[in-house]
Amino acid sequence: MENLPIELLRLIYAYCDPPSVRNLREANRTLADLGYDYLLPPNLSVVTWRQDVDRLLSIAQHERLRGSVTSVCIYLGELSYQDAMKNSWFQHFVLPPEERSEILASAWDSYDQIETRRKTVSPLHSRADDLREACSSLPNLTSVEVCFNRYPSENKVLREVFQEVACRKLDRAQTYGNLDAIIAAIDGLRLSSFQIDRLPLELFRLPDHRKHWFAHTHSFESLSTLHLTLDPSGLKGQGSAMRAVNGLGRLLLLAKNVRHLKLAFHPYSRGNSKFVIMFRELLNGFTYTQLTDLILEGLSCEEHDLTQFLERHGGTLTRLRLGGRGLAKSHEVSLGGIHLYSGTFKSLFKGLRTKLPRLERLHLEGIFECQHHELASHESYNFYPLTDENWQPVPCPRWVRSSRNTINCLTFEQYVLHGGPYPGASFAQQHFGG
């Protein structure tokens, strides 16, 4: 086998799973040498209950292995024990008692092991220097994701119960420190993608953390993908919110070359509420000259302000997603829609027909509602998803049924892209739940 061309051997390795790679490397010296490049997956995980920072640092210091890593996902989510116990019992209620007890006992044994290991591992923020050294020594690192909303356990019960928002806990002070460590670790790297699925918005009003972030965001200029899901539940009062939004705006302005932008708000204190945003204050008229894909979720805004923001990107924007799943429970309708406290969706969508000439796809998900219920122009829609954020089709959710008046956005997309009568007028006659 060692007599085969190098190109063919590399092709064979490319189709091998990790155990096969290890076995193949033991065959002879040639295969052992070639197999170095396939020992590691390109995507590495850092989990807070494992010694993954040490592992990452060792890989970064290895001359042959460090070039294999292109992306790192850092998992910071923690399970709320009491809430998870209660929810997991209800999730397995239909099982026979003995089977249910066995499954749940195994799950909580796994949880106990995780928490025992967590106590032996130093918090991420205390390893800031090691994390920075590791990231700066990975020459091909282009993507960093910070994940609070997935639980990387091998136990299925723990993974599933973690999908319930109530089963996640967040130590905000520790989270600030961990995020500070991460943003310092990536400072100066030429990243193409940076994503956080729960960023406490109040971090941008706290002077020390605010200064730290603005001093360590040089990597943002090279980003082509920036996905930020903000948690505004830690804000107290309008002044606090204004300062935090001002800080968020400064951060967004640094990512001036993004092509894919997601800006979502998940209010953990009130899962069905929307966060008020004025784009003219957030971005001060700034235009992303290369923006092709935009996701906006969980906002309350003015129709005119939103239209102006979208119009500025009419020359490049090809795919637009408004709304999303939000913080809905598994049995609930999507909550991350859009609220207009001024204007109507009819006027908004009519304007988009002419202001976004390059638009190819439009997707709506969640509860869309105008402010003034007493007016004849009032609109309220409950959209279920047709595609995921990568525009791949998804099956019709189980929570869709006619009694909930859920509809899909297909007729609205057709209206914006191709014209015709406004579909909102025939809302009551649309097919529900299909």
Describe these PLM feature segments.
Residues M1-T30, S126, R132, S136, ...:
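N-terminal Skp1-binding subsegment of the F-box domain
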Residues E2-K86, S143, A173-Y176, A185, ...:
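Hydrophobic regular-secondary-structure patch
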Residues L11-A14, E26, D33, I74, ...:
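Ordered, helix-dominated protein-protein interaction surfaces in large eukaryotic regulatory proteins
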Residues Y36-L40, T48-I59, R64-V69, L79-L131, S137-S143, Y151-L179, P200-H212, ...:
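Leucine-rich repeat
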Residues V46, I74, V146, I196, ...:
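Conserved beta-strand positions
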Residues S71, F90, F148:
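Glycine-rich, aromatic-flanked loop segments that form ligand/cofactor-binding clefts
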Residues H212-T225, T229-D231, G237-M242, N246-L261:
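Acidic, serine/threonine- and glycine-rich low-complexity intrinsically disordered segments
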